[in-house]
């Protein structure tokens, strides 16, 4: 399971203030990660209901790495999957904000044909992904 995380550079948060509610994002710079045609709305959950916050991104990219690097440079808040930001979070280069408002984690599935003739490459990939899933895709 993995989920979307809103995060930013700790120094950025110190300078601009840490948002305590989804609506507080309106006063922050945002970095939009996703398809270029994706909605600028960021979705959260508050008291069991979905809350949408429309952002005017400072930077739009379809690369998680670019969004993370820009956030690490102080560009603002970004939303990426937990596993994509795991290294930056672990090293303290980014910090999660609004965690209690994030949507539930998304399940990750590996789909492959059941067969005694499963290729060695597929078997190795399955073993690799399931072996690192707790570290790489762990829940908050």
Where is each model-derived feature located?
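Short loop->beta-strand "edge-of-pocket" segments that line small-molecule binding or catalytic clefts
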Residues: 22-44
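Short helix-loop capping/hinge motifs at secondary-structure junctions, enriched
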Residues: 12-20, 116-120
